[in-house]
């Protein structure tokens, strides 16, 4: 019987995009404050939605802090709620 040729594994490709920089670390922020609107706006899209971790490069704990701060700022009417879709 004839032996089957061995398959070799494909080389592992490098990631297509470089790792995102952590925005909070680059800003030098240790605590997130809901009153700091200018910093919180960097984590909100133009429609008012909270940007995902994939986009911002934050850790899980930092993303939770940002989300809580944005929600508190919305309650205090410092930031807008997400805009509804135009019809």
Swiss-Prot record:
It comes from the Bacteria. The keyword rRNA-binding applies. Signal peptide: none annotated. Keywords: Ribonucleoprotein, Ribosomal protein, RNA-binding, rRNA-binding. GO terms for molecular function: small ribosomal subunit rRNA binding; structural constituent of ribosome. SUPFAM superfamilies: Ribosomal protein S18. InterPro entries: Ribosomal_bS18 (IPR001648), Ribosomal_bS18_CS (IPR018275), Ribosomal_bS18_sf (IPR036870). The keyword RNA-binding applies. GO terms for biological process: translation. One of its GO terms (cellular component) is cytosolic small ribosomal subunit. HAMAP family: Ribosomal_bS18. Belongs to the bacterial ribosomal protein bS18 family. Part of the 30S ribosomal subunit. Forms a tight heterodimer with protein bS6. Binds as a heterodimer with protein bS6 to the central domain of the 16S rRNA, where it helps stabilize the platform of the 30S subunit. This is Small ribosomal subunit protein bS18B. It comes from Mycobacterium marinum (strain ATCC BAA-535 / M). The lineage of its organism: Bacteria, Bacillati, Actinomycetota, Actinomycetes, Mycobacteriales.
């Amino acid at each position: 019987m004839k032996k089957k040729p061995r398959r070799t594994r494909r080389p592992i490709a490098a990631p297509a995009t470089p790792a995102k920089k952590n925005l909070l670390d680059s800003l030098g922020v240790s605590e997130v404050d809901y009153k700091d609107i200018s910093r919180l706006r960097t984590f909100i899209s133009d429609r008012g939605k909270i940007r995902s971790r994939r986009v911002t490069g934050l850790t899980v704990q930092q993303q939770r802090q940002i989300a809580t701060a944005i929600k508190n700022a919305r309650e205090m009417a410092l930031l807008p709620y997400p805009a509804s879709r135009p019809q």
